[in-house]
Amino acid sequence: MVRDIVDDPLDEDDIALVKTYGLVPYSAPIKKVEKEIKELTEKINDLCGIKESDTGLAPLSKQMMQEGQPLQVGYVSCFRYIPIDLLMDIFSRVPAKSIARFRCVSKLWESILCRPDFKELFMTMSSIRPPLLLFTFQDDDGNLFFFSSPHPQIPCNENTSLVPTRYHVQHTTDSFSEIGSPLCGFICRRGKRNLDTMVICNPVTGESVSLPKVELKSINTETRPYLGYDPVRKQLKVLCIKSDDIPNTCDEHQVLTLENGNHLWRTIQCKPHYPKSDGICIDGILYYTAGFDMRARVSMVVCFDVRSEKFSFINIHVFMLMNDSCTLINYKGKLGALQFTCLSPKRLRFWVLVNAEKNIWTKCIYALPPLWNNLVQHTELAIVGMTDGGEVVLSQYCLIYAFYIYYFNLESKSLTRVQIQDVEMFKRTRVYTSLGYVENFKLM
């Protein structure tokens, strides 16, 4: 059973936690914590059949609200008879920002929310919730600013906007980084100058870990990291693909398992190829497009089995006209690909791999709606992916004046523009937009 939560002033370590999670100045965050705890208490009461009069819920005093006073939380006793496993189940259903605040309520709550089994449970619950949009802004110094938001309810009106949740800032030493697609709540980035150095970061916790440097054969050797997940063994791995200006020279690549802080690269063999796209992991298989070398066209989809660490290949015929701008997607559990046509009028090509062994793809071409020119105008857009509802998500490469994302429904041919608010400070900044982000409190 869990002991009572009583008035428990925070010591210096707790106040450091508060500052870490952005709860300064104290007055406004305390009100937010009080509101969030009250909402959490009501959920617990409903689950346990406890009346409000039985909880002994005491509000924070005005004295506590005065700025500069030590942060104290005076909630008592509604958790008296609730087992820890039930508390963890309840905590796992609230947003990550609330968890960050709840860790500062008392040492008891902090101990619960820091448990490895709670972090595993939170990750499981995040995975079954609707995935989030993740926005990563990169300033001129290379610093990364992370925001997330749920998708809007589609269809929505033309004035729809989203206010994203802001996470921690990642400070980098490289003025420009290549940002990979998120997986299991983590992101892998690689510096433009330091091609042998990769960093794994968690936007929610602000934690980042530099991986051991990979071995480069020459100064012309390039690297591209990918994240892959094995759902059977529940292992997250980093695959580092190497390529060179000289064709057919790099047949050794490296893979690393992210677990227990023991990060060691292992060498694996694969025929030389040059990656052309971001990767996507579907049921333990990591996919990305590639050519035979840097200057060659897209001629294959590389398939990497994350568990066995074996490669296979799907040939891309010339007549498919798949190019470097192609975006791979998860279409109802199958590999799909989206790409704009190069010729005017612009259209959208959509492929789905229906039989990998026989290399059979279906293909559709969609004309863009007349509203396209009015809403998009001269904005250069990237294909981000596809939602579970079948809408293609498009995003700006760079924030110029306002930041918009677009939803193109393939069935209705409708186009919806959604403004992302509170990011105006990142004007003329590179932005990476990703689908399928899940919040995660795990450490590496």
UniProtKB/Swiss-Prot annotation:
Protein name, UniProt field: F-box protein At1g53790
Superkingdom as given in the UniProt entry: Eukaryota
Domain F-box: from-to ranges: 76-125
Database matches in PANTHER family: (RAPE) HYPOTHETICAL PROTEIN, BNAA05G37150D PROTEIN-RELATED
Organism placement in taxonomy: Eukaryota, Viridiplantae, Streptophyta, Embryophyta, Tracheophyta
SMART domains: FBOX
Transmembrane annotation, as ranges: none
Pfam families: F-box, FBA_3
InterPro entries listed in its UniProt record: F-box-assoc_dom_typ3, F-box-assoc_interact_dom, F-box-like_dom_sf, F-box_dom
